Amino acid sequence: MKKILSIICTMLIAFGASAQQKSKTLVAYFSASGVTAKVAKQISEAAKADLYEITPKVKYSSADLNWRDKQSRSSVEMKDKNSRPEMAENISSVDQYETIYIGFPVWWDVAPHIINTFIEANKLEGKTIIPFATSGGSSIRNSVKDLRSTYPNLTIKDGQLLNYPTKSEIESFVK
């Protein structure tokens, strides 16, 4: 009986230790229209990850998002490669995360510059960054290329464009 209890205790301790060693995952996202937010929530659930919304200090209005207007806020920000829109607040710490999914709508064939603000405000070296995006017509390819070029010291995976994904597409993405 003592032997059985000893084995059970050993197994419980080993299981508890391995559970604590699991990598912690974060899904951080910016969503202007709500589409990326829906995808981020699906990824968070499938990956059993924490969810964090990257919010601008000044919310974007529909006029700000009018890409046909060269004077709209988003157009002006995206023309300036050094533009870094201020976030309302930053996540308290990313230290505990090993994997960070970063989601965004594709703007002008790249990630909105608030994504750069988030990356530059946090220490992401040594973490695996997996981008995901939503878009009405662009791919994620150039966005990833631009992020890798801007942040060569970060480990940025290929990522995926996820427009209205199915549950199985989300599950496949997080594997």
Identify the function of each model-found stretch:
Residues 42-46, 50, 103, 117-122, ...:
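Structured segments of extracytoplasmic/periplasmic soluble domains
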Residues 130-163:
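Short, glycine-/small-residue-rich phosphate/pyrophosphate-handling segment
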Residues 29, 104, 132-133:
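Short beta-strand->loop
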Residues 19-98, 109-111, 120, 169-175:
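N-terminal beta1-alpha1-beta2 submodule of the flavodoxin-like/Rossmannoid cofactor-binding fold
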